[in-house]
Amino acid sequence: MSHHRIFIIGAGAAGLGMAITLQEFNIKDVLIVEKGTIGHSFKHWPLSTKTITPSFTTNGFGMPDMNAIAKDTSPAFTFNEEHISGKRYAEYLSLVATHYNLNVKTNTNVSRVTYIDGVYHVSTDYGVYTADYIFIATGDYSFPYHPFSYGRHYSEIQTFTQLKGDAFTIIGGNESAFDAAINLSQTGARISIYTSKTGLKKEDADPSIRLSPYTQQRLQNAIQEGALIEMHVGYRAHKVTYQDHSYKIHFDNGHIVHSHTEPIIATGFDVTQNPLIEQLFQIRQSEIQLTELDESTKFPNVFLIGATVRHQNAILCYIYKFRARFAVLAHLVSLREGLPEDTSLIQSYRQKNMYLDDYHCCDVNCTC
């Protein structure tokens, strides 16, 4: 069995960003394993989907590019693009992995992690590895939330404009629902969105709750150009049936909607479906239980990183949010390993707003 001090599962933005930060904290012997290739989830985005956070090379002025995973990189600088496609962002991740000479083993699936005598045993397609620390960076894109018997999930669609039909029904009311609606409207089809709630007109300033300006602007432009998009709020779907070449969407209020095209399910993702999450973390009311250090409450030295981390009102679903935890966790590991503390390095991360050690500072308030 091959032993590594740090074992990171997932070679996406979180996994690679964490590895780079550990490297900067002089923590060696880090292995990253990925079931596909680097940036696997990004490569499977719909072709029209782009980052909703804009990239801009702000490095050097207190905050790196919002989509950067390391403080001295910038996708905007690399590609001269503001909103980046999934395939392009995966290319950025590959460039960064090469630049920092990260140890990444691709096309390697992890089936199980067990804790034996203070050491983690990680079962993979290529045998068992052992490790002292486990970082789960698998994200949620591989685990779509699809609670219905019929319907096509947003993540399963490669090109919206190639779908056949003159009318489509979308279940869901946030980013992916509006992205699907905007793209489908380009074909001239009539789009009906049904949702129990939406971030479209939320008063909350937090972009994890409120619909992003990028999507708001795209929606406004589409409607001004004649897009046929209808919004129905207060409709919670509980069942989708299919009979006589027609889909029926059943809502809690008794309303039934008929659709001749397969409904598009834009209900997000459910990371608790991940077998590794089930093995290593406690789940209560569909929420992963974490300590204030993003550590498992079941096992020591097992951390969750990336967009699936939640702490009360702090939702780390954007790269610029969750990357701020990398240095905090790297610092924690260095202390547990008895390594010398580099206060100047910590300060450099603080100066770049990439050292979030207090979740109580995450309230987003705007006066206007």
Question: What do the predicted segments below correspond to?
Answer:
Residues T106-Y120, V233-H245:
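A conserved short coil-to-beta-strand element within the FAD-binding core of flavoproteins
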Residues F7-I9, G127-Y141, T169-I171, H258-D270:
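Short hydrophobic core segments
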Residues H4-L31, F168-Q186:
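N-terminal Rossmann-like FAD-binding beta1-loop-alpha1 element of flavoenzymes
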Residues G188-Q282, E341-Y349:
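A Rossmann-like FAD-binding core segment of flavoenzymes
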Residues S85-R88, Y133-T187, I193, I283-L293, ...:
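Glycine-rich dinucleotide-binding loop and its adjacent helix/turn
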Residues D270, E287-C368:
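C-terminal, flexible cofactor-proximal segment of oxidoreductases
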Residues G86-V104, V110, T138-S142, Q216-M231:
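Helical element adjacent to the flavin cofactor pocket in flavoenzyme catalytic cores
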